[in-house]
């Protein structure tokens, strides 16, 4: 078991680039539609809720509500972009398209494929999150210098959610099961993590739950940066996101290897 699992790990530090490049070249054919699709939901939240509720709510945590909301939408866009890329694009490459099967006939291992898929999903998250951050800057909700601070956090957020979604991909029998992950995990997390309103407005039990959610850790790093404020517990938040990125990666390797060997 241990020897077989070791053989499925990444063969070296660069093989994954071939998988990333393959996905990138395929994506360039639908890049515009893909980018617009990733931006639609966060933009609706940002300008719909930001403008509508902003007029009624006023200031939240010493910031205008649209500025408060913008940071949450940056993290949310990274979450959704990496998740959807991993479940809705990776799943067919593994199954009906049999792309993974073809790649496994080369010198690449299962680990190389999974790592390449995760880095590609992280790239998609980085583009989506950065685009929303730039929109927030243009709209006057944040400063240009703040974007530089949040870029690494956007990437780490994308990697964490891509790793989590890879577990879902490994377990799901078909596309129909992805809706459970979206409605039972992603959507509640959006409202529990402080993206739309402060976590402090939640009952204490839900505040404790929010403290372990990856999106909450991401927002707690991104929001202070975009609002030009000092962030607290930086090491804790980065460490939590790293755990969400690394542990699910190895767990998904076990699950995917078991699935492909059936």
Curated annotation (Swiss-Prot):
GO terms for cellular component: ATP-binding cassette (ABC) transporter complex. The keyword Magnesium does not apply. Residues 33-259 form the ABC transmembrane type-2 domain. The keyword Ribosomal protein does not apply. Keywords: Cell inner membrane, Cell membrane, Membrane, Nodulation, Transmembrane, Transmembrane helix, Transport. GO terms for biological process: oligosaccharide transport. Its main location: membrane. The chain crosses the membrane at residues 30-50, 67-87, 125-145, 147-167, 177-197, 236-256. This is Nodulation protein J. It comes from Rhizobium sp. (strain N33). The lineage of its organism: Bacteria, Pseudomonadati, Pseudomonadota, Alphaproteobacteria, Hyphomicrobiales.
